[in-house]
């Protein structure tokens, strides 16, 4: 079993940003059409992450011309060019399947507001 883990650890990508369900991401994925290869961007809401190691995947959902489109991406795929986190969402679930039934504003996720560090604020106030 340790041999398998060693081989898997070599194949794991290190350039993946930290993102969770509820975040809006833009995924750049290499698409091969005929003999050509191009990069296609897919932007949407992360509704789930599953698995561990090489088999880890995440599902991104977006609305395209009024129709919901979901795409499952393998996290450590060599065809995955890069992932950009557009905005962080504030959710209390790991799987956001309920978003599939929501339409319009009801499907919006609240944005997570980053709190400033308390340590930095205390030092600024005492210095001023």
Swiss-Prot record:
Record has Nuclease as a keyword: no
GO molecular function terms listed in the Swiss-Prot or TrEMBL record: structural constituent of ribosome
GO BP terms: translation
PROSITE patterns: RIBOSOMAL_L19
GO cellular component: cytosolic large ribosomal subunit
HAMAP family membership: Ribosomal_bL19
Primary role: This protein is located at the 30S-50S ribosomal subunit interface and may play a role in the structure and function of the aminoacyl-tRNA binding site.
PANTHER family hit by this protein: LARGE RIBOSOMAL SUBUNIT PROTEIN BL19M, RIBOSOMAL PROTEIN L19
Name of the featured protein: Large ribosomal subunit protein bL19
Organism: Caldicellulosiruptor bescii (strain ATCC BAA-1888 / DSM 6725 / KCTC 15123 / Z-1320)
